Amino acid sequence: MTAVRAIEVAGVPVRAAIIDLDGTLVDTLGDFHATLNRMLPEFDLPPVTREQVVLRIGKGSEYLVAQTLRIHLDDAAADALYPRAIDAYQRHYGAVNGSCSAVFDGVPEGLQRLHAAGLQLVCITNKPTVYARELLENKLLHAFFGAVHGGDAFARKKPDPLPLLEACRLLGVAPSQAIMIGDSRNDAQAASGAGCSVALATYGYNHGEPIRETPAVAYFDRLDALPLQT
């Protein structure tokens, strides 16, 4: 459904919402933790804790794997092992995807509100597109979205603004007519660079940093509590 007029989200008139996945819609920390701890023994490396993993989420699987290796190895050794490690990670992630994760409270209701208001919804994530679509389908959230674009969909990932600019172009809206809904400074930086507004979840990951230190038009404890005026 395409909005024939702007809908106010957090007081901002918009026609589209660009929504992050990990840490915003679904708590996927368990998936990342389980996958890494399947990967690491292949290289005789010890397991990592959830606390170590959460600090490294948000910039894509390549960053997550590279930084996890550096917990145990120096830069040179981590770089040398990385090509084999990322292949192993992707193989294990395909088997784990969705099995150790859960939809955050208020997300189905929040997506329903946004969709029913007439906003165009698109999911933009740094997760590979095939895994993003699989996860959304697994959690029964896929029907709300007109499109899903993963980290392999465009030449650059968030926090680069390119994915948001491309999403707006494909939706046929100006960036100023879209709001980014996410959980981290990566989402905020991408939105700022693209010229979109941003609303941020207080329950996400954000590299262990207080989210309210990142400028946004709104902060929300549940997606269904995000202010919406039709």
Task: For the regions a language model picked out, list residue spans one by one.
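Structured helix-beta-strand junction loops
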Residues: 60, 99, 117-118, 214
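Asp-based, Mg2+/Mn2+-dependent phosphohydrolase catalytic module
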Residues: 1-15, 112-115, 129, 133-230
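Short helix-capping segments at alpha-helix termini
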Residues: 41-47, 73-77, 116-117, 140-144, ...
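A generic short-segment signal for beta-strand/edge and adjacent turn/coil regions
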Residues: 22-24, 32-34, 90-92, 118, ...
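Catalytic-core regions built around general acid/base machinery
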Residues: 106-118
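N-terminal helical cap/lid subdomain that shapes the substrate entry/recognition surface
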Residues: 2-5, 10-21, 25-109, 130
